[in-house]
């Protein structure tokens, strides 16, 4: 199994999945602002092919402010400033990865292109209303994504931050994959153990131990936009 079409093609034909797309389309048609924009809902899959995934970082639902969400968990397009959870991820990276310099943006595409699947468990949201699409059925779809990676790939690293992500990843086979857990990087919980978790260096140590090229976590310091 090499690509997302093979991994998820049948799933996308399921009635529940068609119903999700209909619900989202109906909201947009009714003038409701839904994030991310339609063409970016599946960006995580477009940027990180099934066979290329090395690391999975699970988010929850997309940012619900204007010009933030673009289909990658935790990532924002310039010139939007990095949101608080991402700021804390950068702080941890600076402590954990020698030489890491904090960029002036929150655009994580360079991670995605190296095999970091930045997957939200719900793929759309209404503007200004967190978790507004949580009951649309997206969780069934993203459960399938994780199940296919769990079953058909090996030696992946799953970074599960916060109780929601940890519950979502509870069935991952720990004998085939590396599962790292910590509190969420949100300012509400980062001090409970996200800071100091060293997940970024641990990820690379695991990949190297399996003969897999590590992730270069350093992002470009500035992005022209």
Curated annotation (Swiss-Prot):
Looking up Gene3D superfamilies in the UniProt record yields: Uracil-DNA glycosylase-like domain
- List, alphabetically, the InterPro entries matched: UDG_fam1, Ura-DNA_Glyclase_AS, Uracil-DNA_glycosylase-like, Uracil-DNA_glycosylase-like_sf
Cellular location(s): Cytoplasm
Q: What is its main location?
A: cytoplasm
Disulfide links within the chain:
none
According to its UniProt entry, one GO biological process term is: base-excision repair, AP site formation via deaminated base removal
**Domain of life according to the entry:** Bacteria
EC no. given is: 3.2.2.27
Q: Which positions are catalytic residues?
A: 61
Output the Gene Ontology terms for molecular function: uracil DNA N-glycosylase activity
Give the record's keywords alphabetically. Answer: Cytoplasm, DNA damage, DNA repair, Hydrolase
Q: Which SMART domains match?
A: UDG, UreE_C
Q: Name one GO cellular component term.
A: cytoplasm
Q: Which reaction does it catalyse?
A: Hydrolyzes single-stranded DNA or mismatched double-stranded DNA and polynucleotides, releasing free uracil
Which Pfam family, giving just one, matches this sequence?
UDG
Q: What does the UniProt record say this protein does?
A: Excises uracil residues from the DNA which can arise as a result of misincorporation of dUMP residues by DNA polymerase or due to deamination of cytosine.
Describe the family membership recorded for this protein in Swiss-Prot or TrEMBL.
Answer: Belongs to the uracil-DNA glycosylase (UDG) superfamily. UNG family.
Q: What is this protein called?
A: Uracil-DNA glycosylase
Name of the gene encoding the protein in the UniProt record = ung
């Amino acid at each position: 199994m090499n690509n997302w079409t093979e991994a998820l093609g049948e799933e996308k034909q399921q009635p529940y999945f068609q119903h999700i797309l209909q619900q989202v389309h109906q909201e947009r048609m009714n003038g409701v602002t839904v994030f991310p924009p339609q063409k970016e809902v599946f960006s995580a899959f477009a940027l990180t092919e099934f066979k290329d995934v090395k690391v999975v970082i699970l988010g929850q639902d997309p940012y619900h402010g204007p010009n933030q969400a673009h289909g990658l968990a935790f990532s924002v397009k310039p010139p939007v400033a990095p949101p608080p959870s991402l700021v804390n991820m950068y702080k941890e990276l600076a402590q954990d990865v020698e030489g890491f310099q904090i960029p002036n943006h929150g655009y994580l595409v360079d991670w995605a292109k190296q095999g970091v699947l930045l997957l939200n468990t719900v793929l759309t949201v209404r503007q200004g209303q967190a978790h507004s699409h949580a009951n649309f059925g997206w969780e069934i779809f993203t459960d399938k994504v994780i199940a296919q990676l769990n079953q058909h790939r090996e030696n992946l690293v799953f970074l599960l931050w916060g109780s929601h992500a940890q519950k979502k990843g509870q069935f991952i086979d720990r004998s085939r994959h590396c599962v790292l857990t910590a509190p969420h990087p949100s300012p509400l919980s980062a001090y409970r153990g996200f800071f100091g978790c060293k997940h970024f260096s641990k990820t690379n140590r695991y990949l190297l131990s399996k003969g897999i090229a590590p992730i270069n976590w350093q992002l470009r310091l500035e992005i022209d936009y």
